[in-house]
Amino acid sequence: RCCGYKFCYIC
């Protein structure tokens, strides 16, 4: 899953 603000982080 992708999450975060401005950038994509693995959740």
Curated annotation (Swiss-Prot):
GO terms for cellular component: extracellular region. Expressed by the venom duct. One of its GO terms (molecular function) is toxin activity. Its main location: secreted. Keywords: Disulfide bond, Secreted, Toxin. It is found in: Secreted. Disulfide bonds join C2-C11, C3-C8. Belongs to the conotoxin T superfamily. The cysteine framework is X (CC-C-C). This is Conotoxin ar5b. It comes from Conus araneosus (Cobweb cone).
